[in-house]
A protein has these predicted regions:
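Conserved lysine of the Walker
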Residues: 3
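Post-Walker A helix-loop "phosphate-sensing" segment adjacent to the P-loop in P-loop NTPases
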Residues: 13-24, 57-58
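Intrinsically disordered, low-complexity segments enriched in Gly and acidic/Ser/Thr residues
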Residues: 159-169
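Charged interaction scaffolds used for protein-protein
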Residues: 125, 148-151
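Hydrophobic positions on the alpha1 helix immediately C-terminal to the Walker A/P-loop
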Residues: 6-10
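Mid-core helix/loop region of P-loop NTP-binding domains shared across ATPases and GTPases
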Residues: 28-30, 42-50, 58-117, 150-153, ...
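Sensor-1/coupling segment of RecA-like P-loop NTPase cores
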Residues: 110-132
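A short helix-turn-beta junction within AAA+ P-loop NTPase domains corresponding to the substrate/partner-engaging
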Residues: 131-147
Length: 169
């Protein structure tokens, strides 16, 4: 099982949680966990587009970055998103140092503004982007995960993560 498979399974479990009212049925839907793929290269506008695509709402990719940011923030608040998982986070390294910093500052902004937990999943090289800024390095920890087999140890790992995460369903 690879990194992407593990996060997809996790995200499917928490992707959409209906809120029920005894008299009215489903009254709302929460998207506590949002899983996206990092843009192919470091680009803030593409990051917002990747977020918006997961809410299945109309938007114009040609809109200014500020409008896309506003839409993404609005939807993440509306759907009570608590965690943003970004697969292939090492793609950020494909941009210039300035572009990398802009994307990382955007992630920091999203984390602060929405009190959002951000999880980046990628290769070992992805950790390099954190070392460009002392504040980023202190904010985002790096955990190396060994290759796992689908056995009891792996299931225990998943259960321990489930207990640590502040998710309710």
């Amino acid at each position: 099982i690879g990194k992407t498979t593990v996060i997809r399974q996790f995200c499917q479990k928490f992707y959409s949680i209906p809120i029920y009212d005894v008299n009215m049925g489903i009254t709302d839907v929460q998207r506590l966990v949002l899983c996206i793929q990092a843009p192919v290269k470091a680009n803030v506008k593409e990051l917002y587009i990747n977020i918006l695509e997961h809410f299945f709402v109309p938007f114009r990719p040609t809109d200014p970055e500020s409008k896309l940011r506003h839409q993404a923030l609005h939807l993440m608040r509306k759907f009570s998103t608590k965690m943003l998982i970004i697969d292939e986070i090492h793609n950020i390294l494909s941009g210039t140092a300035r572009q990398q910093l802009e994307v990382m500052n955007t992630l920091k902004y999203l984390s602060n503004e929405l009190q959002l937990n951000i999880v980046g999943v990628g290769t070992k090289e992805a950790a390099l982007v954190l070392h460009t800024d002392a504040q980023l390095a202190s904010r985002f920890g790096v955990i190396d995960l060994p290759k796992w087999n689908l056995d009891e140890d792996f299931l225990r790992l998943l259960l321990s993560y489930k207990k640590l995460l502040p998710l309710k369903y």
